[in-house]
From Swiss-Prot:
GO terms for cellular component: membrane; periplasmic space. This is Lipid A 1-phosphatase. Pathway: Bacterial outer membrane biogenesis; LPS lipid A biosynthesis. Disruption phenotype: No longer responds to changes in hemin, decreased removal of 1-phosphate from lipid A species. Accumulates bi-phosphorylated pentaacyl and tetraacyl 1-phosphate lipid A species. Lipopolysaccharide (LPS) from this strain is a mild inducer of the human innate immune response via Toll-like receptor 4 (TLR4) in cultured HEK293 cells; double lpxE-lpxF mutants are more potent than either single mutant. No change in resistance to the cationic antimicrobial peptide (CAMP) polymyxin B. Double lpxE-lpxF mutants accumulate multiple mono- and bi-phosphorylated lipid A species. One of its GO terms (molecular function) is phosphatase activity. Removes the 1-phosphate group from lipid A species. Absence of phosphate groups in lipid A renders the bacteria resistant to host-derived cationic antimicrobial peptides (CAMP) and allowing it to camouflage itself from the host innate immune response. Its main location: periplasm.
Length: 445
C-alpha cells in the first residue's frame, strides 16, 4: 500500500460515519426527541439525549491529525529537548503501560462492575473491533510512509503503534466506564499519554508519530463501539449520552499542552569570553480551572521545560554551543472572558521558579573552556495573554503570547575531582517574549 492509498483509507473512514449520519431518519429531529422505540423498553437511570453518530469522534481525532502534521516542522527541536533533559534515559515500561487501560476494563467487568455494555459479548466485540482496526491502520501507515525512526533502527516510525494501542485501550475504557465516573477516563488517558511521551523520551518515535498514533487510537476505539452498537442494536450504545455533568469547579478544569519558542537574547562577559544566550524551544503543561464562585477568575499550575542555549565566543576560536534544560514550575492567576460560546480569551500572571542547571557541550566534543557554566535557581514572573477555541466537548486548540520578566544568576566555576570554586558570578536580565500553540483537554465536561 502506497502513501496515497493510506490517505484515501483515512478519508473513507472519516467519511463513512458522516454518510450514515446523513441517511439517519432522526437527522432532522431535535436531539432531545430522537430516541428509538427500543430505547423506551430500557429506560436509563438518568436522562439521555441523542448524540449524532461519530460527530464528536471526528472532532477529537482531526485536531490531533492536524497537530501531527504541524509538528513535523518542530520534530527536531523536540528531539533536541529530549537529549538536553533526558539524554541517557530509557525504559521498557511503555510495553506494559499501553495495555493497562484495557486490562482495567476487563478486570472491572470480571469483578462484576457493570459498564455501558449489557453483556460480556458486546464489550468483547467492541474491544476486538477497535483493536483490529487499530492494527490495520497503524501497519498501513507504517509501511505507506516508511519514515525512519529517530534512533535510525527501522523505517516504520509513522504512526506510533504503542501510542495508538494505548489510546485505543484508553478510549475503550472511557466508553465502557466513563459514564460511571469521569475519573476512570482521566486515569485511562493519563496512562495513554505517559505511554506516548515515553516513546519520545526513549528516542523511538518523533512527536508527530505520537500525535498521529493518539488520533488513530481514539478513532478506532470509537469506531469499535459504534459498529458493535449497530450489530447488537443496543439502545444504550453510542447514540445516547448521559446528561449528568460534573458541577462546580471540576467541570471547568482545562489541561493544555503547548509548544513554542522563547526569545531571550542577552550577552555575558566572563574574563574576556563572551557568552551569548540564544532562542529556546520548549513545551508547557498547564492545568487551569474557574472557581464556581467566580467563573471569570482563572487559576492554575504550569510546568515548563525548554532548551536554553549558550554560545561561547572568543576571538581565537569559533563559537561553541552549550545547552541545558530550563525547567520551571509556577502558579497562574488571571481573568477569562467568553465572547462566544466556544471561544475564550484570557490574561494572567505566572510567578514561577526556574530551577538550577548545569550546561553541557552540545557538540559532544571536549570543552575548550577550562571552566564550567551553571545557572542558579531564580524567581521568574511572566505575563500571558491567549485565546482558545473549543472544538468538541473534550478538546480544543489554543494560542498564547507571553513576556518573561526576571533575572538569572550564572556561575563560571573551576572544577576538579575534589573541589570547585566560583571564578565569576554574573547576574543578567532573563527577559524575553514567548509564543506558543497547543491543544486543550476538558476531562470533566
Amino acid at each position: 500500500m502506497n502513501r496515497e492509498s493510506f490517505l484515501l483509507l483515512l478519508v473513507l473512514l472519516f467519511a463513512l460515519p458522516l454518510h450514515l449520519q446523513a441517511s439517519s431518519p432522526c437527522n432532522n429531529m431535535a436531539d432531545t426527541t430522537c430516541i428509538s422505540d427500543s430505547a423506551k423498553m430500557f429506560p436509563p437511570a438518568i436522562g439521555v439525549y441523542h448524540v449524532k453518530p461519530m460527530k464528536n469522534t471526528l472532532r477529537h481525532s482531526l485536531p490531533l491529525v492536524a497537530a501531527s502534521l504541524l509538528t513535523f516542522n518542530v520534530d527536531d527541536n523536540i528531539r533536541e529537548l529530549r537529549f538536553t533533559g533526558a539524554g541517557s534515559f530509557h525504559t521498557k515500561i511503555d510495553n506494559v503501560s499501553q495495555l493497562v487501560p484495557l486490562m482495567a476494563q476487563l478486570s472491572m467487568r470480571g469483578f462484576g462492575y457493570k459498564g455501558r455494555s449489557k453483556s460480556w459479548g458486546k464489550m468483547l466485540v467492541s474491544d476486538a473491533l477497535g483493536m483490529a482496526l487499530m492494527g490495520g491502520m497503524v501497519n498501513a501507515g507504517k509501511y505507506s510512509f516508511g519514515r525512519l525512526r529517530p534512533d535510525g533502527t527501522a523505517a516504520n516510525s509513522y504512526p506510533s503503534g504503542h501510542t495508538a494501542t494505548a489510546f485505543a485501550c484508553a478510549t475503550l475504557f472511557h466508553l465502557e466506564y466513563g459514564s460511571r465516573s469521569p475519573w476512570y477516563s482521566v486515569a485511562g488517558y493519563t496512562v495513554a499519554s505517559f505511554t506516548g511521551i515515553s516513546r519520545i523520551v526513549n528516542n523511538r518515535h518523533w512527536a508527530s508519530d505520537v500525535l498521529c498514533g493518539a488520533a488513530v487510537g481514539i478513532l478506532v476505539g470509537e469506531l469499535g463501539y459504534w459498529i458493535s452498537d449497530l450489530i447488537f442494536r443496543d439502545p444504550t450504545g453510542y447514540n445516547y449520552k448521559l446528561t449528568k455533568k460534573q458541577e462546580g469547579t471540576l467541570e471547568s478544569m482545562v489541561i493544555s499542552l503547548s509548544t513554542g519558542n522563547r526569545y531571550i537574547n542577552r550577552q555575558m562577559d566572563f574574563e574576556g569570553k563572551t557568552v551569548e544566550r540564544t532562542d529556546a524551544f520548549g513545551m508547557n503543561l498547564k492545568t487551569t480551572f474557574n472557581p464556581s464562585f467566580a467563573r471569570w477568575v482563572r487559576i492554575g499550575l504550569q510546568f515548563s521545560v525548554s532548551t536554553e542555549k549558550q554560545k561561547g565566543l572568543t576571538r581565537e576560536r569559533p563559537a561553541k554551543v552549550f545547552v541545558a534544560p530550563a525547567i520551571s514550575l509556577g502558579l497562574s492567576a488571571g481573568v477569562e472572558w467568553h465572547p462566544w460560546q466556544r471561544a475564550s480569551v484570557w490574561a494572567e500572571i505566572l510567578p514561577s521558579i526556574l530551577f538550577r542547571t548545569d550546561f553541557t557541550n552540545a557538540q559532544d566534543k571536549p570543552d575548550e573552556m577550562s571552566s564550567k557554566l551553571h545557572r542558579r535557581s531564580s524567581f521568574q514572573p511572566a505575563f500571558q495573554v491567549g485565546v482558545a477555541y473549543r472544538v468538541s466537548d473534550h478538546m480544543g486548540i489554543e494560542a498564547h503570547a507571553g513576556y518573561q520578566l526576571g533575572e538569572a544568576v550564572y556561575h563560571l566555576m573551576e572544577e576538579t575531582s575534589t573541589w570547585s570554586i566560583i571564578k565569576k558570578r554574573a547576574t543578567v536580565p532573563y527577559r524575553g517574549f514567548e509564543f506558543a500553540v497547543g491543544l486543550q483537554f476538558y476531562p470533566f465536561r
